[in-house]
């Protein structure tokens, strides 16, 4: 029999018969490893233990201690177990797809009656029964005709449609546990009993169109979460409870920041308090960008399709664009325009005005670019997923030898912004060359080395995301971690030689000839709308004092203090503090509760004693203790707190 060579993570190699399974390989190492093994990564792909290996490859055996692979298997198996449970309870239900998603899975069902929240408990109970049966998981490869005949006979039209969409040369794998069977690529555990029965929970029911097409059947989607142990599930559910308390939509109402309405889906109606946050943040970013050497520009909202065709967006991005047809002076054909979904092609137009020399590079442009992108209504989410948004967009035109310095400077800039906004920790994901790419290997080598050297120069840890770069260049993604451990991808840095070529951007080099510049796309916040949502949730509404829309409320205890309240407010405002008076005929405890719900950072109470002594009683949000301060001292202290960090 033919032999194959398998290379293990420690670099050692061993010979095996071709067709050996990952389970056999684990058993050859030790009996204990075979008992603990759940799957294997072979040649970079994840397989179950029954998968035969026919060629030389790298191999890593996984156990439940390998969290990434274990979570994938547990969640994948639970998707199948849930579908089986549903069909055992309601046999007439038709199954469709059930992928693994972040923290869990979902499965879409076609059922005449709607699932109720009470049904989730029934399904969970049945799932635990299936887990306790410890049914072996087995797999077979079927030909297309047999698979279609099977699903047609069982009245599963969605599976037939899925099979017809699979390329003809791709094998069709069928997985069973018990008598229940599903079409699936795998991998899966060896029996249902390997799934932790106390570490999953069904979460919610939603509607979903088949294939995401509103003209197709409306299905019912059941979501679940799962982990490798009950303590991890408990921690996740606690985090979800905390996230619900921090939901920016809830806090947005309580703080009177914004609202959304059906007449303008995905567009934000900013109220004065919310707009104060927005403009304060924008002013801060404007100063930071200027200090980093960027020139601010502004480009049109409505742009003719010709530019989008030239840039390539018309072909690749049109479904996300808002198209505007204009009857130009009763011309034979209407002019076709689009609301810009991004700013980069317009920035190239500015670069192309006038001759550019190598001495002009790097040339840095920044724009608070207002963009519009179509998102399905079901994907919209408060101010975090919208159709109209503003980016802190920037583009640098430079030579190849300038990329490293520009990248390092941006990482330093981004780090200082995140720190000022209360995010001490972020992760850099370095996406490298994909399999399908343009450009020479030498150019890719140089550019990837430039980005890696830049990251190392700044001292930030990073993770390689191999093969996930764009077809024309590598990129960096920056992920923030918030106060409850959630990750948010906000910042980006993308190397792009493609768009300057498509839009014919050139500069005159030292040799007197024309050369193409590299275009570096970068954003720090991403969009103001989404980032403000993240800020609200990260801080639970207790924004940094300098960003808070209502920084201080001065509240009267007695009506005789009203004039002094106004005097205090005037003095604070003169010191740059956003201060308001509350002289309503209400009890002070009522005023404190109301303004605390509105997340006002500081409340100054003023009564007869404060009027006489020219003092205030200071209470900070979330604290029970108060302190009596002189008006001059509190004005000076709060004036400093109200100053943006870049101006201190």
From Swiss-Prot:
Annotated region described as Catalytic, given as residue ranges: 247-544
Pfam families for the chain: HGTP_anticodon, TGS, tRNA-synt_2b, tRNA_SAD
Residue stretches making up the TGS domain: 1-63
Gene3D superfamilies with a match to the protein in the record: 3.10.20.30, 3.30.54.20, Anticodon-binding domain, Bira Bifunctional Protein, Domain 2, Threonyl-trna Synthetase, Chain A, domain 2
Cofactor binding comment, as recorded: Binds 1 zinc ion per subunit.
GO MF annotation terms: ATP binding; metal ion binding; threonine-tRNA ligase activity; tRNA binding
Gene name of this polypeptide: thrS
A cellular component term, taken from the record's GO annotations: cytoplasm
Major subcellular location class: cytoplasm
Role played: Catalyzes the attachment of threonine to tRNA(Thr) in a two-step reaction: L-threonine is first activated by ATP to form Thr-AMP and then transferred to the acceptor end of tRNA(Thr). Also edits incorrectly charged L-seryl-tRNA(Thr).
Necessary cofactors: Zn(2+)
Keyword set includes GTP-binding: no
Disulfide partners: none
InterPro entries on file: aa-tRNA-synt_IIb, aa-tRNA-synth_II, aa-tRNA-synth_II/BPL/LPL, Anticodon-bd, Anticodon-bd_dom_sf, Beta-grasp_dom_sf, TGS, TGS-like
Taxonomic lineage from the root: Bacteria, Pseudomonadati, Pseudomonadota, Alphaproteobacteria, Rhodobacterales
Protein name: Threonine--tRNA ligase
Record keyword Protein biosynthesis present: yes
GO biological process: threonyl-tRNA aminoacylation
Species for this entry: Roseobacter denitrificans (strain ATCC 33942 / OCh 114) (Erythrobacter sp. (strain OCh 114))
């Amino acid at each position: 029999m033919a032999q194959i060579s398998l290379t293990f993570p420690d670099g050692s190699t061993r010979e095996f018969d071709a067709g050996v399974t990952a389970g056999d390989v684990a058993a050859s190492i030790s009996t204990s490893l075979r008992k603990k093994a759940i799957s294997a990564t072979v040649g970079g792909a994840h397989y179950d233990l029954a998968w035969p290996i026919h060629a030389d490859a790298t191999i890593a055996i996984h156990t439940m201690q390998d969290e990434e692979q274990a979570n994938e298997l547990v969640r994948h198996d639970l998707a199948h177990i849930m579908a089986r449970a549903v069909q055992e309870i309601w046999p007439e239900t038709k199954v469709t797809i059930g992928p693994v998603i972040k923290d869990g899975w979902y499965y879409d069902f076609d059922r005449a009656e709607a699932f109720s929240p009470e049904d989730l408990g029934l399904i969970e109970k049945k799932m635990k029964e299936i887990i306790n049966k410890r049914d072996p998981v087995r797999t077979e490869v079927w030909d297309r005709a047999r698979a279609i005949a099977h699903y047609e006979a069982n009245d599963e039209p969605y599976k037939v449609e899925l099979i017809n969409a699979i390329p003809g040369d791709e094998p069709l794998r069928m997985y069973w546990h018990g008598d229940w069977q599903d079409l699936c690529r795998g991998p899966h555990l060896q029996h249902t009993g390997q799934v932790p029965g106390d570490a999953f929970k069904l979460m919610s029911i939603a509607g979903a169109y088949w294939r995401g097409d509103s003209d197709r059947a409306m299905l019912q989607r059941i979501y679940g979460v799962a982990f490798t142990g009950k303590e991890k599930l408990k921690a996740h559910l606690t985090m979800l409870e905390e996230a619900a308390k921090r939901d920016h939509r809830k806090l947005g109402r309580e703080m009177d920041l914004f609202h959304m309405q059906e007449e303008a889906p995905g567009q934000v109606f900013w109220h004065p308090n919310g707009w104060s946050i927005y403009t304060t943040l924008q002013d801060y970013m404007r100063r930071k960008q200027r200090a980093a050497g960027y020139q601010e520009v502004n480009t049109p909202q409505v742009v003719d399709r010709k530019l989008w065709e030239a840039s390539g967006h018309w072909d690749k991005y049109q479904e996300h664009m808002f198209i505007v047809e204009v009857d130009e002076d009763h011309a034979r054909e209407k002019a076709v325009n689009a609301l810009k979904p991004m700013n980069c092609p317009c920035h190239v137009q500015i670069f192309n005005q006038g001759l550019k020399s190598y001495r002009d590079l790097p040339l840095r442009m920044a724009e608070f670019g207002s963009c519009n992108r179509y998102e399905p209504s079901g994907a919209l989410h408060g101010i975090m997923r919208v159709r109209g948004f503003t980016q802190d967009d920037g583009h640098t035109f430079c030579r190849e030898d300038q990329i490293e310095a520009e990248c390092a400077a941006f990482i330093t800039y981004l780090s200082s912004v995140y720190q000022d906004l209360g995010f001490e920790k972020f992760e850099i994901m370095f996406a490298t060359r994909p399999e399908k790419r343009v450009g020479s290997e030498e150019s890719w080598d140089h550019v990837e080395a430039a980005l890696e050297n830049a990251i190392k120069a700044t001292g930030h840890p990073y993770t390689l995301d191999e093969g996930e770069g764009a077809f024309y260049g590598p990129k960096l993604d920056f992920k923030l971690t918030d106060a409850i451990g959630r990750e948010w991808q906000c910042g980006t840095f993308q190397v792009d030689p493609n768009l300057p070529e498509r839009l014919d951007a050139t500069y005159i080099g030292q040799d007197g000839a024309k050369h193409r510049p590299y275009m570096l796309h970068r954003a720090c916040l991403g969009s103001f709308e989404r980032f403000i949502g993240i800020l609200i949730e990260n801080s639970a509404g207790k924004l940094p004092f300098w960003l808070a829309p209502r920084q201080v409320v001065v509240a009267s205890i007695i009506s005789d203090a009203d004039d002094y309240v106004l005097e205090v407010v005037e003095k604070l405002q003169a010191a740059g503090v956003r201060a308001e008076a509350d002289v309503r005929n209400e009890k002070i405890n009522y005023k404190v509760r109301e303004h605390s719900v509105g997340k006002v950072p500081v409340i100054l109470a003023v009564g007869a004693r404060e009027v006489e002594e020219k003092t205030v009683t200071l209470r900070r949000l979330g604290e029970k203790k108060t302190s009596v301060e002189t008006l001059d001292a509190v004005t000076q202290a709060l004036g400093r707190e109200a100053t943006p960090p870049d101006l201190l």
